[in-house]
Structures are given as C-alpha cells and as structure tokens.
Amino acid sequence: MNSKFWQQRWQEGRIGFHQSDVNPELIKHFSTLALPIGSRVLVPLCGKSVDMMWLAHAGYDVVGIELVESAVQAFFIEQNITPTITEFISAADGSTLKRYQGQLAGQTITLWVADIFALSPTAIGGIAAVYDRAALIALPADVRPDYSKQIYKLSNNAPQLLITLNYDQSKKDGPPFSISQEQLQQYYDANYEIIELESQSSTLNSAAELSVTEHVWLLSKNQD
C-alpha cells in the first residue's frame, strides 16, 4: 500500500472519494447479503465513511481498516464517540498496528489503523460479510490481485457487496480506477459467484465530463 500517497491526500484535504451522505447503493442492496442482526461487517480502506454509521444503526458490528490514522480519528470525533485505543505488533511484518474501538447505536465499531496486508484473520476476528465501496477501485492494477486474496483470507470467503466504476482509463488517471467485468472475474472468479445487482451512469468529481458507469456486485461463496 502507498502510505505516503494517502497520508498526503488526507493531510491536504483531497478526499473527493469521501461521501457526506450514506451511499444509496448500500441502503438499497445490503439486504442481499442476508445477514443476521449483530453480524460483523468488514469495511476495507474505510476512511471516515458514514456508511459505517448506517451499518451500526442497522444493527451490525463494523470492522474497518484504514491506512491513515487521522481519518480514523476524524470518524470518531464526527460521530461523538470516545474510542478505546490499543496498540499491537503485526505478526505479518512487525509493524505497529492501532485498534480504535467504540460503541454506536449499541454496536461495536472497530477501526484498525494499518496496512491491510499487515493484518491477519486472528487479529480482526470473525467476519460475516464485506462491504467494499471504495477499496478495490482505489488500488492500482498490480495490487488488486493480492488485495482480493487478502480480503478472501481476512473474511474466510464471506460474501461481499462490492461497488466498481467503469470508464475509459486512458482519459483519466486513477484513483478511483476503472475496473472491467473481465478484471473483476480475474480477481474473484476462483472463489466467488459474481452477480451484478445494478449498473447506472455516474460521474467523477475530478472529471465531470467523463462517461462513467457504476456497477454494484454481489460476491457469494462459490459452491463448486
């Protein structure tokens, strides 16, 4: 993960990827995961997303992973939550990890300040589903295969609600990056059944003139 790049983006306030409102596709399609109330939902590269607030109010515990500590701090400040902060040493690479944990709407929100590749399933605990709105599309092509494998490992092949964007990558540098259906299949087809729930026209704040299609996917455990 490119720590310096993301640290600089947050420091300079260049966080156009952050949405001030809950993502409507989360509200519309989350039920397709068919999770029991109280289940734990993993939100990779979570930033300070208010989607995590929605998940807690809907009755789910949240486990977020974020590289930039100021983003995690901002989430708890903006939600008026005083977190408990604990430090750990990563068994994967020896780096220092921080876990911020607090309560919202009776649910536990646990946000890890860490490179996602430094975490293990043992560290984060059991995961019932993954909500990926802005993680896969934030990563360059050479990182995505390893990322998809890490998510598979961290979640023990839990189902995913995944949002991607598709546009002419030659007309704009990412992030967010364009991801085709063929690329998605390369990343996930070995372990998941991939179902498209919706596609619709969208826009990018940094390139309003660009033709963009947003896709919503359900990734369920491959039964083969």
Where are these regions (language model features)?
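Conserved acetyl-CoA-binding loop of GNAT-fold acetyltransferases
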Residues: Y60
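Local beta-strand N-terminus motif with an aromatic residue
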Residues: G38, I109, G126-I127, A135
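Gly/Ala-rich phosphate-binding loop of Rossmann-like dinucleotide-binding domains
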Residues: A56-H57
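A short SAM/SAH-binding and catalytic strip from SAM-dependent methyltransferases
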Residues: I116-A118, I127-D142
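Class I SAM-dependent methyltransferase "Motif I" SAM/SAH-binding loop
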Residues: L42-G47, A135
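Class I (Rossmann-like) S-adenosyl-L-methionine-dependent methyltransferase catalytic domain
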Residues: M1-A34, K48-M52, G64-A123, S148-Q150, ...
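Short helix-loop-beta connector
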Residues: A34-R40
